């Protein structure tokens, strides 16, 4: 797996990108907490920022993030509920899901995180793309696998897919209780646990890799490396800030011009 690359814009906005997704033609970005002129780049939905960012400021930041993708593209999100639900853009406002698929180069599929795992997936052959939000509950429910199944239903082949895993809380910072340990054990993710004495810890990065591999992705089709939101000042951390923190966006745009005659049926 290749690590994500840090890109710094002329206004000093910092985002992370995947070399594999970029080489395949997918416009995408994982935001950080570092915005233009080093402002705190909170991409929470306007009016709902846990750190109290002014709604007008949130709106300006969202427009700035969208400019990373060129053109005048809307950012398409869902109401995230820690599930295995997958929506397809355009989704109705308030749609509850934890992944969103785009089928062309119009809207930006995006998810919000501040410790959970953001995953971006693209299929170069069909042009399909998806953004996925995966906390421990979503990994137990296998939202990565559900997203890959939904992409296959729309013509993607697993061997075509490229995935990039963004920053999330690391194993040293993610202390979990017995209920989480039991849930991960039952979901076949026991190898992603570091058990006590004392409290146990969970490795969300490795759990994500495990889910992607179980869904059929090869290791050399996955980009990313452990980047801990709780210990790296470039990122927001819900747990590290006791809830009063900003939100990242991870976004991706599909590739237009897909020929329907190339779409396979499953």
What are these regions (language model features)?
Residues 1-266:
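Active-site microenvironment for binding and transforming phosphate-containing groups
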């Amino acid at each position: 797996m290749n690590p994500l690359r840090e890109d710094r814009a002329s206004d000093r906005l910092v985002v992370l990108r995947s070399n594999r997704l970029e080489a395949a033609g997918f416009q995408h970005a994982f935001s950080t907490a570092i915005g233009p002129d080093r402002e705190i780049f909170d991409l929470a939905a306007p009016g709902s920022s846990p750190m109290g960012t002014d709604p007008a400021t949130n709106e300006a930041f969202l427009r700035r993030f969208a400019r990373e993708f060129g053109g005048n593209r809307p950012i398409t999100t869902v109401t995230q509920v820690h599930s295995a639900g997958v929506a397809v853009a355009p989704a109705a406002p308030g749609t509850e899901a934890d992944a969103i698929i785009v089928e062309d180069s119009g809207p930006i599929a995006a998810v919000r995180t501040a410790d959970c795992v953001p995953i971006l997936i693209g299929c170069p052959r069909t042009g399909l793309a998806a953004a996925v939000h995966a906390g421990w509950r979503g990994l137990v429910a296998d939202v990565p696998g559900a997203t890959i199944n939904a992409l296959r239903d729309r013509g993607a082949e697993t061997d075509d897919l490229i995935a990039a895993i963004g920053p999330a809380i690391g194993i040293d910072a993610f202390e979990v209780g017995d209920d989480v340990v039991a849930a991960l054990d039952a979901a076949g993710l026991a190898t992603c646990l570091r058990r006590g004495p004392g409290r146990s810890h969970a490795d969300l990065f490795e759990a994500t890799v495990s889910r992607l591999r179980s869904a059929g992705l090869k290791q050399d089709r996955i980009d990313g490396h452990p980047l801990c939101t709780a210990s790296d000042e470039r990122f927001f951390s819900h747990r590290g800030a006791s809830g009063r923190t900003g939100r990242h966006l991870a976004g991706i745009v599909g590739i237009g011009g897909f020929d329907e005659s190339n779409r396979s049926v499953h």
